[in-house]
Amino acid sequence: MDIIYAVPTVLYRMLEMNLPHTHNLSSLKTIRYGGSPISPAKLEILLELFGQIFVQGYGSTECWPSVTILGRKDHGTQTHEQIARLQSVGRPMPGEEVIICAEDGLVLPAGQRGEIRIRGPNTIAGYYKAPELTKKNFSGSGFWKSGDMGYMDEKGYLYLVDRKQDMIITGGYNVYAIEVENCLNSHPAIQNSAVVGLPHDLWGEEVRAMVMLIQGSTTSPAELIDHCKQHLARYKAPKKIEIIDRLPLSPAGKVLRREV
C-alpha cells in the first residue's frame, strides 16, 4: 500500500496509536486527507512522524472530488510562512474558479472573510428536479454557494473559517467553532473536540465544548478553558467543557457537532 485516503479523525487515531513506530509503513508514499478541517498543531506532528507526504483536497458532492489542492511542497514546516500555510486548503486546481463573497454577492478582496463560492467543470449545474433549491444555492453567474466561510490570501491560497450555519454569536461577537476546536486540539491531552453554541439569556449564545482525550492522558475542564484563554480572545473561550468518552461521527468520520 503506497497511498491512503483519510479524514482528520482517522489521522488523529493514527497519532494516538503511534503507528509509525509500531508498524512498518515504509511503502506509504502519499497520505491524502480532507472531508473536514484538520488541526494545524496535529498536522505538524504528523509531518514530523511521516514526513512531507501529505496532500489535502477540498471539495464537495456538488463539485466532486476536489476544487483546491494543498500539495506535498505546501506541507513544509521550515519557515513561519510555511507553518501558517498548513491552515489553508490550498489553491484552486486548473479550471476551477473560487471567489469570496459578502451576503449581497459582492466579491471580496484577499484577506476578507465571506462565503466561498465555486464554479468549474466539475460543479453541478443544479439540483435534480429542485428548481427552488437550485435558485437558492446558485448565483446568477453560475457560482455554487458552498455555505463555507473563508478567505483567500494574496497568493491565492484558500482558508476555511467554518460552516456558515456553525458560527456562534455571543454578546454580539462572532465565534467560529473550528477556531476554538483547533485551539483545544492543540492541547497535548486532546484527541478531538466539538464546539457548539447553546442558548444563553444574557449573551444570546454561549460557547460550549466536548472533548475526547488521548488514551492515558489526563486534564481538567478548568485547565482546558485556561488553555483557550491563553491562545484566543477571552470571549471565544468555552464557558463550559465536558470530557466525554466518544464524539459522534458520521460514516465518513466527521464529527457531528449537532449530535453532541
Name each model feature, range by range.
Residues G35, G59, G90, D148, ...:
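Active-site glycine-centered loops adjacent to acidic/histidine catalytic or metal-binding residues
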Residues L25-L28, I190, P238:
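Core-facing hydrophobic residues within beta-strands of well-ordered domains
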Residues I4, G120, A125-G126, L133-K136, ...:
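AMP-binding/adenylate-forming catalytic core of the ANL superfamily
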Residues E97-I99, A110-I124, F143, M149-G150:
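AMP-binding/adenylate-forming core of the ANL superfamily
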Residues M1-A6, L15-A84, E97:
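Gly/Ser/Thr-rich phosphate-binding loop
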Residues V10-L11, I38, T123:
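Alpha-helix capping/helix-boundary segments
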Residues L86-P92, V107, F138-S141:
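Short Gly/Pro-enriched turn/cap motifs at secondary-structure boundaries
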Residues V55-E62, G90-P92, V196-L198, E242:
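Beta-strand->loop->alpha-helix junctions that form or flank phosphate-binding loops
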